[in-house]
């Protein structure tokens, strides 16, 4: 029987859990006082880089979102250090944070579809 997931997929899932816990419990930056959701993690095949896609509860203002992403990217070395302690990997990937706006796009589409059904 073949494995359903390759190693990078399993590591991405584990990174998603650990980074979400670190952001919620260990990151004490007062500039980030909103709920942050780690929606997806993409790991390179050689496990040297990980792209972390996050969404914010209050993500209406694009400028605030960019500031929060910048803050998270500046704290990525601290988060990586905590990951080294919590995960048993020989190489812990470098972390790059990106904003995931798929929830907002999906919400806009559902509102448009809802308005279309009301007009009919």
Swiss-Prot record:
UniProt organism field: Buchnera aphidicola subsp. Acyrthosiphon pisum (strain APS) (Acyrthosiphon pisum symbiotic bacterium)
Domain of life where this protein originates: Bacteria
InterPro entries according to UniProt: KH_dom-like_a/b, RbfA, RbfA_dom_sf, Ribosome-bd_factorA_CS
Gene: rbfA
Record's protein name: Ribosome-binding factor A
NCBIfam families: rbfA (TIGR00082)
Biological process terms in GO annotation: maturation of SSU-rRNA
Alphabetical UniProt keywords: Cytoplasm, Ribosome biogenesis
Entries under PROSITE patterns matching the protein: RBFA (PS01319)
HAMAP family with a match to the protein in the record: RbfA
Subunit structure: Monomer. Binds 30S ribosomal subunits, but not 50S ribosomal subunits or 70S ribosomes.
